[in-house]
Regions:
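A general, composition-driven signal for non-globular sequence regions
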Residues: 1-3, 8, 70-72, 93-98
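An N-terminal amphipathic alpha-helical segment
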Residues: 1-63
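Well-ordered, non-membrane alpha-helical segments in soluble/globular domains
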Residues: 26, 65-75
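Short, charged/polar micro-motifs that form catalytic or ligand-binding hotspots
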Residues: 61-69, 90-93
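C-terminal edge-of-domain segments
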Residues: 73, 78, 83-107
Length: 107
């Protein structure tokens, strides 16, 4: 395998992980939005190190969600287009927080 082939293979694997993480996270967050909205709340927090999220989207995808700013931007844009405010913050090196809200948008 040449260096170029190795690079292309690595790029393809990275793109595949990005796509899987994006799709699984969108599905998970949509389920959570439906659940929280039915309870009458207007926001919720998700944590990439949370066992429920890891079980739903996968460990690799959860790590990608926590550390990939391009994935975070893509998710933010997707949900903003649907009327949700999504913010990502990092409290420390190992813990990040995702807040999804829609109350501000109702005003």
């Amino acid at each position: 395998m040449t260096a170029l082939e190795a690079k292309e293979k690595a790029d393809a694997a990275k793109q595949s992980l990005f796509k899987e993480a994006f799709e699984k996270t969108v599905e998970y967050l949509n389920e959570q939005i439906e659940k929280i909205a039915s309870e009458g709340r207007y926001y919720f927090y998700a944590y990439p190190n949370d066992e429920d999220l890891i079980e739903a989207i996968g460990e690799r995808e959860a790590k990608e969600l926590s550390y990939n700013p391009d994935l975070q931007t893509a998710l933010r844009k997707k949900f903003e287009a649907d009327g949700f405010l999504v913010t990502f913050s990092r409290n420390c090196v190992f813990e990040s927080t995702i807040k999804i809200s829609w109350e501000e948008l109702l005003k």
